Amino acid sequence: MYGIEYTTVLTFLISIILLNYILKSLTRIMDCIIYRLLFIIVILSPFLRAQNYGINLPITGSMDTAYANSTQEETFLTSTLCLYYPTEAATEINDNSWKDTLSQLFLTKGWPTGSVYFKEYTNIASFSVDPQLYCDYNVVLMKYDATLQLDMSELADLILNEWLCNPMDITLYYYQQTDEANKWISMGSSCTIKVCPLNTQTLGIGCLTTDATTFEEVATAEKLVITDVVDGVNHKLDVTTATCTIRNCKKLGPRENVAVIQVGGSDILDITADPTTAPQTERMMRINWKKWWQVFYTVVDYVDQIIQVMSKRSRSLNSAAFYYRV
């Protein structure tokens, strides 16, 4: 009886010793594998060229700041370029492979295939409502049209700057502009804007608040209007709301990843006279009107100089962001 108990105890002790030996062996093997892996990583890390995300980036500040690529100095290998052009350009060229041709030409300037996107827009009105400025760098080609000169200059002001916008209910409220950076931006197929300035008793100054025909007309049947009135004065507005939307906007500063190239025209569009445009923009350029092939060749040839006056941005814009933070 006692012999059986001694045997059981001895077997139990041997099992514990054997299990302990196995666990220690496994631990030594795992330690060896981990240490060797870490040693290999340490040896190879100086030879690796990989994008480093998240390190040395501040967690505060503007998301508009352009952060440099710490491991890659070649700008074009890590960036995207969007080239916006009117429908008539593709119609005139009439070549199914013209984009492939331009992509190969951009490749000679350091832009890899697939990094340049060609974006077509129908007209200024549709483009202003839904710009979709998604790329790191965005270059907009606008053919000069004397009948749309004002719309073109205002579109340039719109996309070359950032705006913080809110909806306006002109049927219920009076509105005033607080400073020079505060504007009212209207968009639509036909925008006619009338204003009636009010005194401290909310009576019209030179107009009747109950009669829109006495209001001062500041825009007539335009597709895009940036309205500027006397600061600090309440205004009652009359807008063709059936074909136009109006928003109360604040200019925040330049949108430096966008450039506008005017194509042709005897007059040069210029928004630098606006006192809120500071510093004077260099991102608005002009190409003499030629065939569209010649225009695109010129853009390819001078793309490096164009990009040099721009700054890469970390945020893309769609139509929703455009309305509330343009």
UniProtKB/Swiss-Prot annotation:
- GO cellular component terms? host cell endoplasmic reticulum lumen; T=13 icosahedral viral capsid; viral outer capsid
- Describe its PTM? N-glycosylated.
Name the major location: virion
Q: Which residues form the signal peptide?
A: 1-50
Q: List the disulfide bonds.
A: C82-C135, C165-C249, C191-C244, C196-C207
Q: Please list the residues that bind Ca(2+) 2.
A: Q177, D228, V229, D231, D301
A single Gene Ontology biological process assigned to it is: receptor-mediated virion attachment to host cell
Domain of life of the organism encoding this protein: Viruses
As for subcellular location, the record says: Virion; Host endoplasmic reticulum lumen
Would I find Ribosomal protein among this entry's keywords?
A: no
Q: Please give the residue ranges the record annotates as the region GPR motif.
A: 253-255
Carbohydrate-modified residues are N69
Q: What does this protein do?
A: Calcium-binding protein that interacts with rotavirus cell receptors once the initial attachment by VP4 has been achieved. Rotavirus attachment and entry into the host cell probably involves multiple sequential contacts between the outer capsid proteins VP4 and VP7, and the cell receptors. Following entry into the host cell, low intracellular or intravesicular Ca(2+) concentration probably causes the calcium-stabilized VP7 trimers to dissociate from the virion. This step is probably necessary for the membrane-disrupting entry step and the release of VP4, which is locked onto the virion by VP7.
Further notes on this entry? Answer: Some rotavirus strains are neuraminidase-sensitive and require sialic acid to attach to the cell surface. Some rotavirus strains are integrin-dependent. Some rotavirus strains depend on ganglioside for their entry into the host cell. Hsp70 also seems to be involved in the entry of some strains.
Question: How is the subunit organization of this protein annotated in UniProt?
Answer: Homotrimer; disulfide-linked. 2 Ca(2+) ions bound at each subunit interface in the trimer hold the trimer together. Interacts with the intermediate capsid protein VP6. Interacts with the outer capsid protein VP5*. Interacts with host integrin heterodimer ITGAX/ITGB2. Interacts with host integrin heterodimer ITGA5/ITGB3.
**What family name appears in the similarity comment?**
Belongs to the rotavirus VP7 family.
Q: What is this protein called?
A: Outer capsid glycoprotein VP7
Recite the lineage of the species. Viruses, Riboviria, Orthornavirae, Duplornaviricota, Resentoviricetes
